[in-house]
């Protein structure tokens, strides 16, 4: 491994660990550490690129005893072992300086499997786990995984047949526990799955919980933009300052599900919806992510990054860097011990 690159990844990992649970008296030190990591990232990024922090990738091993609940054979090309060796070199070549993993499985022990899988690899700096919010074992499971500082939050598969937000007493207890620990909540909100009105109710009920809506908030192409979707997006962004939007999985706008389908690679196919998200949430609340390897069902990793870079370029390097890496470093960290 190139020594300077290894130093970069170690610096970023150290920065995130230092930021996690940082007491107020040490805020200045945290800021200095973050600035140093950003500077080193910029120095070591491949020529002609700016740094990227990846916030949404998945690993799984279908060949393990018992397999995995998802993907299934129906997902075709991604129903195979997907491990760090499949991703790391490709990501580095595309300017990714650090990556966060999102757990795709609802099996509690699979959270530990991921943490163990990348324990010795500082390139993978944070992990969004998967626990059933509202489950009787939630508090115990969260306390267990919270001992690992890389465990920064939870993916929002919530109790109920539709994995929906009910704000039941059990869910509220779990969500407040998450907020109390300074962790984050990733949510899918599209169609009947966690409708925007329910996300708004959640953000109001737990205002100190940082929430991020994955994959463009369920945007669907082509233009013109659906008026109801736009209204709901703008209302949510306005009412809920604790809600962020993941600028991720662009190809979903056209794909009919997790099946092989060639989505467009031209910015023009996405720009109208991107504009809604940018004007609603602003550059401070958009966070890049890919949804690799799922995106490979519909297009290439490189092309998706190119779409993002092309869209952000006219807005200047400050906006680009916020969306593509700086916002991620601020959002995906533990704000309390």
Predicted regions and their residues:
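Mid-to-C-terminal alpha-helical segments outside catalytic/metal-binding sites
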Residues: 4, 9, 26-53, 78-98, ...
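Bacterial N-terminal signal peptides
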Residues: 10-20
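Mid-domain alpha/beta scaffold segments of enzyme catalytic cores
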Residues: 28-173, 177-181, 193, 268
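Catalytic pocket-lining loop regions of alpha/beta-barrel enzymes
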Residues: 31, 152, 165-287, 336
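Conserved, mostly hydrophobic/aromatic
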Residues: 56, 114, 154, 178, ...
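Short glycine/proline- and charge-enriched loop/turn segments
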Residues: 67-75, 260, 302-308
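Alpha-helical packing segments of well-folded alpha/beta enzyme cores
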Residues: 86-90, 110, 141, 174, ...
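Active-site-proximal loop/turn and secondary-structure-junction residues that shape catalytic pockets
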Residues: 106, 133, 158-160, 189-193, ...
């Amino acid at each position: 491994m190139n020594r300077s690159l290894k130093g970069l990844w170690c610096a970023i990992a150290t920065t995130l660990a230092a930021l996690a649970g940082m007491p107020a008296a040490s805020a200045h030190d945290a800021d200095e550490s973050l600035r140093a990591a950003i500077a080193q990232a910029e120095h070591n990024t491949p020529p002609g690129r700016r740094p990227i922090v990846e916030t949404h990738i998945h690993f799984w091993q279908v060949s393990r005893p018992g397999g995995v609940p998802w993907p299934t054979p129906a997902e075709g090309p991604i129903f195979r072992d997907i491990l760090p060796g499949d991703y790391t070199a490709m990501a580095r070549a595309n300017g990714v300086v650090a990556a966060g993993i999102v757990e795709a499985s609802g099996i509690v022990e699979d959270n530990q499997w991921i943490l163990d899988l990348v324990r010795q690899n500082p390139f993978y700096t944070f992990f969004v786990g998967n626990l059933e919010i509202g489950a009787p074992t939630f508090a115990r499971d969260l306390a267990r995984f919270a001992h690992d500082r890389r465990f920064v939050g939870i993916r929002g598969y919530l109790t109920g047949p539709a994995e929906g937000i009910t704000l039941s007493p059990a869910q509220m207890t779990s969500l407040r526990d998450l907020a109390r620990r300074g962790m984050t909540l990733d949510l899918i909100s599209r169609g009947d799955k966690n409708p925007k009105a329910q996300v708004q109710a959640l953000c109001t009920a737990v205002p100190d919980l940082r929430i991020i809506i994955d994959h463009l908030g369920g945007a669907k192409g082509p233009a013109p933009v659906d008026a109801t979707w736009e209204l709901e997006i703008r209302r949510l962004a306005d009412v809920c300052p604790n809600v962020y939007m993941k600028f991720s999985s662009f190809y979903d706008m056209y794909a009919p599900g997790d099946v092989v389908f060639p989505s467009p690679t031209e910015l023009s196919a996405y720009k109208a919806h991107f504009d809604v998200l940018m004007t609603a949430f602003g550059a401070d609340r958009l966070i890049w992510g890919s949804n690799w390897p799922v995106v490979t069902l519909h297009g290439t990793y490189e092309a998706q990054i190119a779409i993002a870079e092309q869209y952000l370029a006219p807005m200047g390097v400050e906006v680009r860097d916020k969306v593509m890496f700086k916002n991620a470093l601020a959002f995906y960290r533990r704000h309390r011990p």
